[in-house]
């Protein structure tokens, strides 16, 4: 069978270049595909050749995939395109590894036989791989099923007291939405647990209208009022302390000013009194001297001539 294919391929290559040939080849995605191209080295010798994409009779492997010099590969576009035959013996069949659907299209083999170029055209069609394994996704059968959910709040503290507030009791009803799905009939129960309740919480509100919905809510005590009163007293104490400090400063300042003023007045009075006494002493001294003079003139009477 292989000899017949080689013989037919050789006849196709020996046809004149003007005669067009078009061979259809089919492949499966994910598997290698081989496009045969064999020429006789006894007729024209070992010659260069190339593989190209598209119709390359008029473009001569412009979109080249592989070039050979007749002995080895000189250019390779991608490792997916390989020549696995004996190149020097004329077996230049192209093998495309791991094909995909996008690899489909025209391919051409060009052999540079002296005096003329010979072409072999192929139209490759790659079909997608058909999976034979059974589907892993189960099919949903049966009638629609409704899941009913029930919320249960379980407080961890056992201490419960009733507030004396005249406000009416608060009732809370939890009604979850129903969800419908189709696999199997199941009923799910959802339980929610509240966090730990502090020991200083006193007010509780309990709703028991529905036996399925038993929700207990804990309300913290009203402590902000106590904190507000404490802050008010602290503010008053600070204000009183500031006023007392201000009054003390004013009294001390007034005392210092009055003391300095009294000292300055006593210092000025002393020189004035001292200056006022001096003229009196001078007058008395002058009078005393006059009297002395009078006494001195009296003991010596004038002699009569």
Curated annotation (Swiss-Prot):
Disulfide bridge partners, by residue number: 37-109, 50-61, 56-108
Gene Ontology cellular component list: cell surface; plasma membrane
Tissue expression summary: Expressed on late differentiated Th2 cells. Expressed also on all splenic B-cells, with increased levels on germinal center B-cells, in the liver, especially in bile duct epithelial cells, and in renal tubule cells. Within retina, mainly expressed in Mueller cells.
Stretches assigned to the Cytoplasmic side: 253-305
Residue spans of biased composition, Low complexity class: 131-167
Disruption phenotype annotation: Deletion mutants lead to ferritin accumulation and iron overload in the retina leading to retinal lesions.
Pfam families per record: V-set
Glycosylation sites: 86, 91
Family: Belongs to the immunoglobulin superfamily. TIM family.
Additional detail: Belongs to the T-cell and airway phenotype regulator (Tapr) locus, a single chromosomal region that confers reduced T-helper type 2 responsiveness and protects against airway hyperactivity (AHR), the hallmark of human asthma. The human genomic locus appears to lack the Timd2 gene.
UniProt-recorded name of the protein: T-cell immunoglobulin and mucin domain-containing protein 2
Gene this chain is encoded by: Timd2
